[in-house]
């Protein structure tokens, strides 16, 4: 009994250690510093410097006749050229308007055109990367976030879905459900809503209007679409793989189906009695030598075997659904890494660390779901590696896509439009339909308490990671 309780306690200690690591990193990084660093990486200036530029007070004469609109396109001029626009709130020699602070197509003595990205305002630090180095960094970071959680799986003392590992597997499943729900509600959906609520080109005094409800409504519809799509896929897979599996849900239905070949419909009033009589007649007719012992064997065994077949089929479908959701989620992680490295090496490293902290508990939960669905430990680990294809594809898409805003999770507006909320809907479906029902089985009070703590641990882990982002 001591050995049986050791593994769940070991998992609890591991979860608490990981939570402490998240708190340590969160306290060290700080939300304000992260926001300032990201702002400097995205726009090339800090709030302090822009404030000084507004009150610099210099005034130069400009002779090229550029209009106010031309300033927004990032034209640069030397110090001997200048202009006096009364409607500008600064007199700096670059001649950039207030709106141009969101773009970085200017310089002191030479021109730059980076399409929204570029070098950091810090002197002596070159942030833009050549093409080969950019691809090497981005793909290397993607391989890292895919391989690091894979090695963590070796430490989990679960080999298969057997009674010997059942208690530990249930705790891991509860942790997986908490991680999936926390990921959907605290990470994916907020990131999908964030570009619509805090657009960088939005006017400071612009109020909310009814037109802004459209994107928010579309995010909600995509979440529901993900739930419905996963429901349709599960029904389709059950229909193709299960076929007659639904008629085996109860032992009495099974017996009636076999006995109905030689009898009419007069058996329906007394279903239980007649099905047992049919089994007895069939046993006496086809297996006369075994007599009643066969009926006693087949009676309790048939419902058990059919129920196990049904349960195994259900869990296999849930495993496939979880792999599909994990593949889409890894695609968004790849988009985040590729887009962040396009914004600069420092931003790319920061995003990689954040995604890595997020992926380790997530992969542990996915591993538990795969093992519960009938996979061995090696099979589950191989399937987890296959989902890395989604991350590599997302990174390649982010690097090949020109333009677009750099977000913490998507490149441009493509991913935030439907990938994130659709994936969130898939996570919600897998957690509530496939994983949580497994936690409703009868268990001891201690086991039930550990399962609830595991679920809360998964949610708390996502809260800590959300603060880091």
UniProtKB/Swiss-Prot annotation:
Q: Write one Pfam family the protein is assigned to.
A: Zip
**Modification(s) after translation:** Methylation at some His residue by METTL9 leads to reduced zinc-binding. Rapidly phosphorylated by CK2 following Zn(2+) treatment. This phosphorylation is required for efficient cytosolic Zn(2+) release.
Residues carrying Pros-methylhistidine:
66
Q: Where is this region: Disordered?
A: 43-122, 242-313
Q: Name one GO molecular function term.
A: zinc ion transmembrane transporter activity
Q: Does the keyword Transport apply?
A: yes
Q: Which residues form a coiled coil?
A: none
How does the UniProt record describe the way this protein sits in the membrane? Multi-pass membrane protein
List the biased-composition ranges (Basic and acidic residues).
43-56, 66-114, 295-313
From start to end residue, where is composition biased (Low complexity)?
256-266
**Single Gene Ontology BP annotation:** skin epidermis development
Q: What are the Phosphoserine sites (modified residues) in this protein?
A: 275-276
Segments of skewed composition (Basic residues): 242-255
Q: Which UniProt keywords apply?
A: Endoplasmic reticulum, Golgi apparatus, Ion transport, Membrane, Methylation, Phosphoprotein, Transmembrane, Transmembrane helix, Transport, Zinc, Zinc transport
Which cellular component terms (GO) are annotated to the entry? endoplasmic reticulum membrane; Golgi apparatus
The UniProt transmembrane annotation reads 5-25, 138-158, 169-189, 214-234, 386-406, 417-437, 448-468
Q: Per the record, what are the reactions this protein catalyses?
A: Zn(2+)(in) = Zn(2+)(out)
Sorted alphabetically, which InterPro entries does this protein's record hold?
Answer: ZIP
Which family does the record assign?
A: Belongs to the ZIP transporter (TC 2.A.5) family. KE4/Catsup subfamily.
Subunit comment for this entry?
Homodimer.
State the protein's purpose.
Answer: Transports Zn(2+) from the endoplasmic reticulum (ER)/Golgi apparatus to the cytosol, playing an essential role in the regulation of cytosolic zinc levels. Acts as a gatekeeper of zinc release from intracellular stores, requiring post-translational activation by phosphorylation, resulting in activation of multiple downstream pathways leading to cell growth and proliferation. Has an essential role in B cell development and is required for proper B cell receptor signaling.
Annotated protein name in UniProt: Zinc transporter SLC39A7
Q: Which organism is it from?
A: Canis lupus familiaris
